[in-house]
Amino acid sequence: MRTTSNAAVKQPVLRSGHALICGSMAYDTIMVFQDQFKNHLLPDKLHMLNVSFLVPQMRREFGGCAGNIAYNLKLLGDVGHVMATVGHDFGPYAQWLERHGMPREHIRVLADEHTGQAFITTDLDNNQITAFHPGAMGHSHLNKVGDAGHVALGIVAPDGRDGMIQHAEQFAAAGIPFIFDPGQGLPMFGGEDLRRFIDAASWVTVNEYEWSLMAERTGWNEAEVASRVAALIITRGGEGSVIHTGGERLHIPTAPARAVVDPTGCGDAYRAGLIHGLLHSYDWEQTGRVASLMGSLKIESRGTQNHHFTRGEFVARYESLFGKFR
């Protein structure tokens, strides 16, 4: 579905090269509490909370936004170069990247830090309590975009605050188009910071909640943000996504999942689809549909980097839902 407006947009020109993915890499420790949190929380005692949950199930996953995006991009046949800071415990993750053919020359290891760690406890209602230790991620500003060669486009995904600011500035100064994807890092920034990110970026992508916060802090509505970038992409969960580009408003439908197993990392899979479409010059409708299908394929598997498919399987699934794949 298309609607039109009179918005002006800046159209980026991509050089030949690869995607540079600036963002976090982390270990996700996921635990399952075999009950409901609400049965163990006293509403009148929340000011003096002291609880302990027995979690018989636990697993450790490779995660972080940059790692997840790179993994999904590799499934689509592209090689994304991750720029991130990690700690002395990165060895198992490094082996995982090597096994899957994902470069790590722009991943800086800090011997005195831990790799970012998320500790997630989920109850039987899929409510989550998460504690996150940023560790080495807080030093992401030590990495410089200029150290990476042959970059066609970049993405500034959730990372250390200073790193996100500096990488956006460095992409803009180098004339490299980039996606601003603030994600869960958005609350770190005030309105003036966000306005600068938007004005520097070529594309902006957020989910519905993040958009509400961005609009509130910047004072800009959808049309005002869309007029400053080549595309504003807002994902709306089960309602699909909306892409504002070239004065048009495109509605991208969801790709029905065969099973809903784990939504964690779906946003990163979606963003890999956006990058793939941009690298291969798809139109925005096809790019959005590729991104939508990536999110659905991810939701069918537990964890953020455990799903697999071949190129042929992806194209067949796409064509069964949306018609001819370019």
Predicted feature residues:
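Glycine-rich phosphate/adenosyl-contacting loop at the front of the ribokinase-like
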Residues: 2-81, 92-95, 325
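Conserved phosphate-binding/catalytic region of the ribokinase-like
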Residues: 2-16, 219-326
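A short, aliphatic-rich alpha-helical micro-motif
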Residues: 14, 147-149, 198, 226
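Active-site metal-binding loops of divalent metal-dependent hydrolases
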Residues: 25, 159, 269
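Gly/Ala-rich phosphate-binding loop of Rossmann-like dinucleotide-binding domains
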Residues: 74, 172, 279
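Beta-strand->loop->alpha-helix junctions that form or flank phosphate-binding loops
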Residues: 83-88, 105-115, 230-236, 253
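Conserved phosphate/ATP/ADP-binding segment of small-molecule kinases
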Residues: 165-252, 259
